[in-house]
């Protein structure tokens, strides 16, 4: 992974297998591009923090302190501005959480903390802040680091089963 081009300092570091952004700064993205994939990722954030995972650099799955809130496309598990989870599975801040996200074409399934919250729905367009609008092309995984502290670990990307 590498820092996205920016005037800001790269604040990311790895310690004991945990990728950490201690404060707002640059986004981080893979050097490889992916078309159809399954992503497993675990994350933790402090109270009131906000991050996101951009699939192919174009579709943001929200990572935000949303414990106790009504489901929304702008809270944990939502595809920002487009798809609202059927349930809010957010844990309290400071607890490790997980996503298993499958993206095939523009169809996405999001499993948060072991429960499917978005099932095989079409993402209608790119999210604000996307790297580009070339939806038919492979793209990187981008971790948002410009909104607040966040930690990620146990990141795996595989080919989805048919």
Predicted regions and their residues:
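Carbohydrate-interacting regions of secretory-pathway proteins
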Residues: 1-162
């Amino acid at each position: 992974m590498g820092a996205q081009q920016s005037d800001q300092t790269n604040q990311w570091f790895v310690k004991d297998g945990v990728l950490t952004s201690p404060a707002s700064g640059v986004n981080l993205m893979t050097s490889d591009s992916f078309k159809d994939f399954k992503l497993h990722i675990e994350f933790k954030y402090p109270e009131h923090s906000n991050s996101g995972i951009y699939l192919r650099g174009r579709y943001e799955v929200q990572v935000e302190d949303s414990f106790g809130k009504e489901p929304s496309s702008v809270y944990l598990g939502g595809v920002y501005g487009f798809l609202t989870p059927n349930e809010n599975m957010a844990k309290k801040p400071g607890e490790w959480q997980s996503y298993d996200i499958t993206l095939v074409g523009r169809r996405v399934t999001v499993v948060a903390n072991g429960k499917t919250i978005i099932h095989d729905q079409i993402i209608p367009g790119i999210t604000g802040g996307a790297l580009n609008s070339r939806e038919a092309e492979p793209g990187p995984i981008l971790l948002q680091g410009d909104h607040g502290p966040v930690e990620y670990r146990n990141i795996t990307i595989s080919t989805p089963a048919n």
